[in-house]
Amino acid sequence: MNKKSYLRRVRLPRTPADWLEAVMNFIFFLCGMLAVCCVVLISVYMVVSGVPAIHKIGIFKFLFGTKWASTAAEPLFGILPFILSSVYGTLGATILGVPIGLLTAVFLSKAADPKLRTVVVTAIELLSGIPSVVFGLLGMQVLVPAVAKAFGKASGACLLSAIVVLSIMILPSIVSVSVTALNAVPPEYEQSSLALGATDTEIWFKISIPAAKSGIAAGVVLGIGRAIGEAMAVMMVAGNSPNMPDSLFRSVTLLTTAIAKEMSYAGGLQRQALFSIALVLFVFIMLINVVLNVVLKGGNRDE
């Protein structure tokens, strides 16, 4: 690169419009760096706060211990029941919520009458705005007794109730992002298939959904993040006993509810252990995003 071309690229602003452009670019840069700094600071804080307890307890005892008795004379800090409960709860909510959300998105994007689409979209937007505590309250008053009665259990506060509540809570994220992704599919894809004699259902499931898979996957990840990070609603319907989740009807504690339940009165090593649980949860979220990026990049290369 010669000196003149370099000077043209880095020339100082001369007119008011140039100065405004430079200032706005700097503001955009600061906003981007602010987001990066927030992630870095949160990561550093979680590591600094969570590692000491893991070091004191022992990483194997902490991650794979099956007993949690943080207030006992000889406290135990095994979080394997919390990890498995969170994994099972999130997996169950995903299994229930993703098909419903995806089919709803296909209906809204491709098949719904405009008036009906408006009604459904409004309902989904309202669903996304309902506070977590309201979901928990409705689950506690309606779902928990219904589960107990339907399956003949003494209490319906269990893993199954948590899964049902979470599957409802993740629907708005999955539906809204999937609808946007499906609407972005070029019409030529569908028109070409229609000209070849494909039915609407074949076009939707063999053309539209595969073409929108990146956006749909992003919606699923948002839903998974909502499910694995939810605390209040789950705490009201899951039972909050530190049991291994060996049954759908078992009263369980998830990673998030363990923190919310004990942080208000925790101190010393117990408080440090709760920060360690938060660190484990933070790592889970990061791993989910990394796996998604790897899968999507692999899919794009295959295409």
Label each region the model flagged:
Residues 234-282:
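Interhelical loop and adjacent transmembrane-helix boundary motif
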Residues 125-170:
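Generic hydrophobic transmembrane alpha-helix motif, especially the helices
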